[in-house]
Amino acid sequence: VTTPQEVALLDSRKSIGFAESLKVPIIGVVENMSGYTLRGKGASGSVFSVLGPGGKDIDVTVSDDGSWAVTLDIFKSGGGASTAEKTGVPFLGALPFDPGVVRGGDDGVHRIIAEPEGESAKAFSAVVEKIEDFVSQDQDSDGLEII
């Protein structure tokens, strides 16, 4: 699990190299805190601009039902997928930055349980499915290897 910043990705690449040197199977890379989605309501069809990270203007259009959403890459994005590709390990997915996960932990009700159809729950579920697929595969293993 990594965050999208270069210093975290460097640590992840080192960890992958270390695991490979010990012949420890690597399930894959997960990018955590990958984008923060702001949501709101406005006049249907209106367009406004949000000042994103790095001073980048992001145009947002309000949908017919009056809702809008914009995802800001606060900590960058795509680094997990790029690291997985460069190191030849599977990319398991990206988990959004969600303050509700922290609040849920403090309140004793995990965000995934409280909001099973939410963005975070769907992202976690997609990652978990890939991990389950990996674990359920018949691994050709001769047991432990002394190195």
Regions found by a protein language model. Give the residues of each.
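Conserved Switch II/interswitch segment of TRAFAC-class P-loop GTPases
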Residues: 1-16
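C-terminal lobe/tail of nucleotide-utilizing enzymes
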Residues: 16-147
